[in-house]
Amino acid sequence: MAKGQSLQDPYLNALRRERIPVSIYLVNGIKLQGQIESFDQFIILLKNTVSQMVYKHAISTVVPARSISHNNNGSSQAQAPQQAVQTTQPVEAIVATDKME
């Protein structure tokens, strides 16, 4: 097994096994959505209303609908999405502060 496959295969397998919806962005900018039905060294079968065979060399990014946690032993596990933490003031607060000056 190639060293580059050691992260890719468990990641794709977790997405497939958990039936996590994914968005796949191709290098030409096209966005495909569905669930990973199967994959091998060269292709990913993406299922939505139809099954599409997508060549990996045409893929730029795979974005799962929810987070995947990775264990050091190579296995992956799905997690519910985490809520974003707000670290700045809301825009309304900034606008209100500017008007008061």
From Swiss-Prot:
Q: Where is this region: Disordered?
A: 68-91
- Please provide, alphabetically and separated by semicolons, the GO molecular function terms listed in this UniProt record: RNA binding
Q: Which GO terms describe its cellular component?
A: cytosol
Top-rank taxon of the source lineage equals Bacteria
Residue ranges annotated as transmembrane are none
State the UniProt keywords alphabetically.
RNA-binding, Stress response
Give the GO terms filed under biological process for this record: regulation of DNA-templated transcription; regulation of RNA stability; regulation of translation, ncRNA-mediated
The Sm domain sits at 9-68
* InterPro entries reported for this sequence: Hfq, LSM_dom_sf, Sm
Spans of biased composition, class Low complexity? 77-91
Assembly, in brief, is: Homohexamer.
Report the family membership. Answer: Belongs to the Hfq family.
PANTHER family given for it?
RNA-BINDING PROTEIN HFQ
Q: What does this protein do?
A: RNA chaperone that binds small regulatory RNA (sRNAs) and mRNAs to facilitate mRNA translational regulation in response to envelope stress, environmental stress and changes in metabolite concentrations. Also binds with high specificity to tRNAs.
Q: What is this protein called?
A: RNA-binding protein Hfq
Protein species of origin: Haemophilus ducreyi (strain 35000HP / ATCC 700724)
